[in-house]
Amino acid sequence: MCIRDRPILPKMDRVGYWAIEAWGGATFDTCMRFLDENPWERLRSIKAQTPNTPLAMLSRGQNLVGYKHYSRDICNHFIKAAKRNGVHVFRVFDALNDIRNVVDNAEAIKECGGHFEGAISYTMSPVHTLDSFLDYGQKLKDLGADSICIKDMAGMLTPYRTERLVKAFNAEIGLPLHIHCHYVGGMAPANILKAAEAGAAIADTAHAPLAFGNSHPAVEMIVAALQESRYD
């Protein structure tokens, strides 16, 4: 999306979303590379149109929004600049779930009064067990995480694995749990339904024109699926 899509933002601001993820990750690079836009102006412009809804960004931990590790002072200044320009929720992940690459971000977020959402990169291997995810979740909590995100960036989660994860995190970690499932494998809508039933607090969706494929389930689909339930 580009800045010219701003007319939809006031309507989105009235929906009541927990947050709108509008910045960080690859969007910082791609808005310059393909749209010739200033990412900081883009952020300020979006925030001006969404005064009632917190904006969220994705940080790659020590990589921030780039493709290499940055120093502690750069992490500190970048996070605080993002907060000043409109970001409130900072979802921070490390692809290897290495807590050392999250520490500098976490400290800066807490210092500037942002919401630190610690993200757990979900994948499947002999070492990626439920206990390993819970252990990392506890490390994020110890760093001061305000919420935890299960980040299924490759669409590998299944509905019943999702249910087990959510129940275990609610029992052992006790922070609001956020489910982030890409639609790649087609199971994301079912994962969100099982997550809701198991007690997840938040789920990521996208508006229908930008949903499905490598994106997320459509918000319209999830709203319809939850109608006439206690999650409506």
What does each model-found stretch correspond to?
Residues 4-91, 95-232:
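Catalytic cores and adjacent flexible loops of soluble metabolic enzymes
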